[in-house]
Amino acid sequence: MTKYIFVTGGVVSSIGKGIVAASLGRLLKNRGLKVTIQKFDPYINIDPGTMSPYQHGEVYVTDDGAETDLDLGHYERFIDINLNKYSNVTTGKIYSEVLRKERKGEYLGATVQVIPHITDALKEKIKRAASTTDSDVIITEVGGTVGDIESLPFLEALRQMKADVGSENVMYIHTTLLPYLKAAGEMKTKPTQHSVKELRGLGIQPNMLVIRTEEPVEQGIKNKLAQFCDVNSEAVIESRDVEHLYQIPLNLQAQSMDQIVCDHLKLNAPQADMTEWSAMVDKVMNLRKTTKIALVGKYVELPDAYLSVVEALKHSGYANDTAIDLKWVNANDVTVDNAADLLGDADGIIVPGGFGQRGTEGKIQAIRYARENDVPMLGICLGMQLTCVEFARHVLNMEGANSFELEPSTKYPIIDIMRDQIDIEDMGGTLRLGLYPCKLKPGSKAAMAYNNQEVVQRRHRHRYEFNNKFRSEFEAAGFVFSGVSPDNRLVEIVELKEKKFFVAAQYHPELQSRPNRPEELYTAFVTAAIKNSN
């Protein structure tokens, strides 16, 4: 029988529910249990695919092509699993599916209501996420905070699950903030008490509290919360601020969180062996070197827009015993005249993805600086496309060369729309999304980075591609197409072989990086940057 764990939040948003859920998932996985995890987002968008990065941060893409919340990146990195489209559910997605069924007459003339139709659809998503992965345990995080009007159908669905599958198969975990008032010199429990009262008013009694705090929590405070919130005192778990996120699973294990969960759900599983994880954390805490990487992006005011890129750089740094000193460079600020001033102190330069024209000329100048000064450079998605544009302009002398996306009237459309995208008008969910194979060119830097594999599978999110009409001219000038689709139609990786490391990929390698298993192309880039700093 599948066990269901529901993680809710109270008092404030962005309290760390996702990290708590991911950390618990890691502990349960290391007990030998098969775990999956999902995120409920109460916003009305179908998915975050068309949302501004300033609103939502990065869009995380799964193997099967779902555009999802960035928390799924935390889930995959912590638990080291590959999630699917059932792992992210929004209000918009549920309502659109229910309304589509209503239009088809599938409700047989019934009045379609929040209860039971919306809540049934939500419960079906929970069960589908578990069944498609054959999991022993599914952890479901509900975005937002208890009391938000848009969360009510989600919480009602969670309440109903207890009756549907039995109380012994369901556990409710509530995360809250425990503020410390310096003036009073004490922690205040009232916000948590009221949050739990609100949750109980909706019919959900939490079985565990996870309290986010900056200071250590005395046992007396835990006992008080246990008494007023009707949970066992040992089930009041402290989640204190830490230097590195990957410490959190160890901190939760030290408080027997996973054992309490197993006892409640009657899961007979051995103790979690966190030896490898602990060794990784110890290494992270004691890195001996520092490498400066300049990230040239258009959304640098919000680092979450590049969360997976940053984490992938860190992971590759761990493998090289180096901390990553990230220098955020706004692409709008980079010109041919100041590129050396902005980028001259960087050991390596990364140019990540993005959409739209703003900042693209600055990215092109950053790529030009890296090429002309032989600074290790990694381009991702749009960064790969602009690498091709830069080479066309400044090496092949194709004046005005550009991407058709950015300048439809260009004489040299180096990057063009994919053939199967020409007639598509909708923006959401219509890109080339998900896992696709990439055939590597033997002897190339890309092939060496991937240990001379013939083919790798990586996740994509794009609508435009390199225009093959120009391929022969590029190759004649020494531009190497080191990764292509198996049918040789789509360019996946480009590079300049004579440079220390000048490689750009159409796909998003960062989405498959893990703290204890870094992505190979990122690792090759960081390794080259370290050598460049010596």
Swiss-Prot record:
Binding site for CTP: 13, 148-150, 188-193, 224
Record-listed L-glutamine binding positions: 54, 354, 382-385, 405, 463
Amino acids binding UTP: 13, 188-193, 224
Region (Amidoligase domain): 1-267
Keywords: ATP-binding, Glutamine amidotransferase, Ligase, Magnesium, Metal-binding, Nucleotide-binding, Pyrimidine biosynthesis
InterPro entries: Class_I_gatase-like (IPR029062), CTP_synthase (IPR004468), CTP_synthase_N (IPR017456), GATASE (IPR017926), GATase1_CTP_Synthase (IPR033828), P-loop_NTPase (IPR027417)
Domain spans labelled Glutamine amidotransferase type-1: 292-534
Organism domain of life: Bacteria
Active site: 381 (nucleophile), 508, 510
Pathway(s) it belongs to: Pyrimidine metabolism; CTP biosynthesis via de novo pathway; CTP from UDP: step 2/2
Reaction(s) this enzyme catalyzes, per UniProt: UTP + L-glutamine + ATP + H2O = CTP + L-glutamate + ADP + phosphate + 2 H(+); L-glutamine + H2O = L-glutamate + NH4(+); UTP + NH4(+) + ATP = CTP + ADP + phosphate + 2 H(+)
GO molecular function: ATP binding; CTP synthase activity; glutaminase activity; identical protein binding; metal ion binding
Gene Ontology biological process: 'de novo' CTP biosynthetic process; pyrimidine nucleobase biosynthetic process
GO CC annotations, alphabetized: cytosol
EC number: 6.3.4.2
Residues that hold Mg(2+) according to the record: 71, 141
Catalytic EC class: ligase
Miscellaneous notes: CTPSs have evolved a hybrid strategy for distinguishing between UTP and CTP. The overlapping regions of the product feedback inhibitory and substrate sites recognize a common feature in both compounds, the triphosphate moiety. To differentiate isosteric substrate and product pyrimidine rings, an additional pocket far from the expected kinase/ligase catalytic site, specifically recognizes the cytosine and ribose portions of the product inhibitor.
PANTHER family the UniProt entry points to: CTP SYNTHASE (PTHR11550), CTP SYNTHASE-RELATED (PTHR11550:SF0)
Similarity section: Belongs to the CTP synthase family.
Assembly description: Homotetramer.
Function: Catalyzes the ATP-dependent amination of UTP to CTP with either L-glutamine or ammonia as the source of nitrogen. Regulates intracellular CTP levels through interactions with the four ribonucleotide triphosphates.
Name under which the protein is recorded: CTP synthase
Biological source species: Streptococcus pyogenes serotype M4 (strain MGAS10750)
UniProt gene name: pyrG
